[in-house]
Amino acid sequence: MNPQDIKTALGSGLLSFPVTHFHADGRFNAESYKQHIEWLAGYDAPVLFAAGGTGEFFSLAPSEIPGIVSAAKEAAGKTAIVAGCGFGSVVGVEIAKAAEKAGADGLLLLPHYLIDAPQEGLYALVKQICDAVGIGVMVYNRDNSVLGVETLARLCDACPNLVGFKDGTGQIGLVRQITATMGDRLIYLGGMPTAELFAEAYLGAGFTTYSSAVFNFVPGLAVEFYRALRAGDRPTCERLLRDFFYPFMAIRNRRKGYAVAAIKAGVRLQGFAAGPVRAPLDDLTIEEEAMLDALIGTWKR
């Protein structure tokens, strides 16, 4: 898929980041993963992100990523697959090339590993990744990797295949300046944990869409919220926030890392053999899984 096509796909609907399925011993469970991807693709997600943040990119070996991308492509049908990429310049370029070879339609460049870096260094890293592939690339502002407006503008000029910007900082002033400055040069994706909690603010700041983590296990509910948001149906949005998203947030906030672990628990509760999270994350307790099971309620498949 060429960069313009993936840009169009990214902006055409609700997106999600499937969890990566593991066997009990930690190995990638390709069959269960493909079953899950096929189920999600049936809800007309235009793009799914393989080996992204919710997919435990940070705990994957670079050598595992092409197999995950390939499995996602096999099961996704018409749904495009964007692969996670990151760590640093050398490893990042290797991952980018391998993901493209495995069939990825685009890349999401996650924050680099550990260290704070100046804007010039961030510019160089993003440019190296973009230059290494022919597919579209989306950058992710979060934690120690926050591109400023001028840096992002330079990258837009230097990298024709830079097609998207995802924000996980919550800095609405910065993201509004970015959308006002870059306009339709990029597609804009809200990427805060449990993005539905912030979706109205981000759409008001000029963002195109967002990625829904809960789409992993309650895709029908996630789509209902998205459609209500797009239609300006505030009563429905508020009902779903009260009845599902705020109670889910309470479970998610019980321990660090539950933004991923709670999603994977939801996938298991829907009958998929998603397996455990990898260290350093930890799974929900039996009590917490019961709370989540009750919350899913009528949204069981």
UniProtKB/Swiss-Prot annotation:
Any one GO molecular-function label of the UniProt entry: 5-dehydro-4-deoxyglucarate dehydratase activity
Keyword Lyase: yes
InterPro entries with a match to the protein in the record: Aldolase_TIM, DapA-like, Dehydro-deoxyglucarate_dehyd
GO BP terms in the entry: D-glucarate catabolic process
Catalytic activity: 5-dehydro-4-deoxy-D-glucarate + H(+) = 2,5-dioxopentanoate + CO2 + H2O
Pfam families linked: DHDPS
EC id: 4.2.1.41
Pathway it works in: Carbohydrate acid metabolism; D-glucarate degradation; 2,5-dioxopentanoate from D-glucarate: step 2/2
Keywords: Lyase
PANTHER family xref list: 5-DEHYDRO-4-DEOXYGLUCARATE DEHYDRATASE 2-RELATED, DIHYDRODIPICOLINATE SYNTHASE
Family: Belongs to the DapA family.
HAMAP family found in the cross-reference section: KDGDH
Protein name, as recorded: Probable 5-dehydro-4-deoxyglucarate dehydratase
